[in-house]
Curated annotation (Swiss-Prot):
Reversibly transfers an adenylyl group from ATP to 4'-phosphopantetheine, yielding dephospho-CoA (dPCoA) and pyrophosphate. The lineage of its organism: Bacteria, Pseudomonadati, Pseudomonadota, Gammaproteobacteria, Enterobacterales. This is Phosphopantetheine adenylyltransferase. GO terms for cellular component: cytoplasm. It comes from the Bacteria.
Length: 159
């Protein structure tokens, strides 16, 4: 039986930290779904369609990654996708409490859904999409933190 995992997030935009996590997940699981949440309450900079397209381009080199958008509860989406593993990145202790709450709620909604936490590589442990956007808005150089296609799209958005 194939091990199908879902790596969910808003990915607004996808960063090299996200790419690091999904790349390592592909070595652990047969099929990884990069699930991009619509998240209208977060008022994303990029539309869902743009985020999906950017992530598809940024992960094209990973043969066992499928990118798709979703707007349902994660447990419902996982059930539909026949996946029982959630990948979550943990950057710092501050992430842990929130992620633990999500993991317990997801397990309540779908008892067979396991959350697997991956630490990003040290190089990416301090970045977030929000931080990268904030630095870019103030003309800071964020080239190192984003896939090339995403960096270009971000610069175009900020013009």
């Amino acid at each position: 039986m194939q091990k199908r995992a879902i790596y969910p997030g808003t990915f607004d935009p996808i960063t090299n930290g996200h790419i690091d996590i999904v790349t390592r997940a592909t070595q652990m699981f047969d099929h990884v779904i990069l699930a991009i949440a619509a998240s209208p309450s977060k008022k994303p900079m990029f539309t869902l369609e743009e985020r999906v397209a950017l992530a598809q381009q940024a992960t094209a080199h990973l043969g066992n990654v499928e990118v798709m958008g979703f707007s349902d509860l994660m447990a419902n989406f996982a059930r539909i996708q026949q996946a029982n593993i959630l990948i979550r990145g943990l950057r710092a202790v501050a992430d842990f409490e929130y992620e633990m709450q999500l993991a317990h709620m997801n397990r309540h909604l779908m008892p067979q859904l396991e959350s697997v936490f991956l630490m990003p590589s040290k190089e990416w442990s301090f970045i977030s999409s929000s931080l990268v956007k904030e630095v870019a808005r103030h003309q800071g150089d964020v080239t190192h933190f984003l896939p090339e296609n995403v960096h270009q799209a971000l610069m175009d958005k900020l013009k």
